[in-house]
Amino acid sequence: FQAEDGIRDQPRSRGLGDVYKRQAVSFVLAGTGVPVAKHGNYSATSKSGAANVLKSLSVNIDCGIDMVQKSLDNVGICFLLAPKHHSAMKYVGKIRQEIGIRTVFNLLGPLSNPALVKKQLLGVYDKSLILPFAESLKTLGSTHAWIVHGSDGLDEVTITGKTYCAELKNGLIREFSINPSDIDIPSAKLTDIIGGEPEENAKEINELFNGKKSTFRNVVILNSASALVATGHANSLEEGAGKSIISLDSGEALRKLEELIKITNS
């Protein structure tokens, strides 16, 4: 099993429950034609993990490898539940939940996508991890990647202010930063972009895909644009934002969600 492009589930950031935005981004990317191999788990240190949100969206996340491959081949997006594809993970999940704080697994998880994707956007929960992760991805064979950390502490591209970034491309690493104003997206407060329980997050994703204009839409567009640049499917944030908006407004992102629900439950 292998996918050329992908956006992975990142380490939790302060337990703020922000992971649901990345689920929306995955479907937006798939709606632009980028194959997406999501790798994630149930929440261990935050309100809502990738698996929690997708389950609330009615996606069957307990699929075997054959169905995962079929989803990627036929829909353009798949989800790999960590305990099913890394057998050791199922023995530590309960312990991680009981501990309730970040552990080494928050660092190992983003580096262990079973799809072996070579291009990705990856968020880290501390600015000091940006370069070490870039070096690690280089060693693991990634060809193009962005590693990001929001100045507000989020492990994603933020719209509250600056996002610190490192780009790995052709074996070279460069550092830079981006701001929402770079593509004319208004800034927002941190409280405006933090998610809640899985059901709430799923509801907001469905509303987004059905045309709701909101701060959530803005942060999804900025993260999707960044992911398109990071995977070589856009040459600039402006181009990436344009493709992301088309994916949302044309209904392609929603169609990808509906197709994934259908195929994983067939």
Language model feature labels by segment:
Residues 33, 55-62, 67-266:
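Glycine-rich anion-binding loops and their surrounding alpha/beta cores
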Residues 8, 37-43, 105-108:
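Core alpha/beta catalytic barrel or barrel-like domain that forms the active/cofactor pocket
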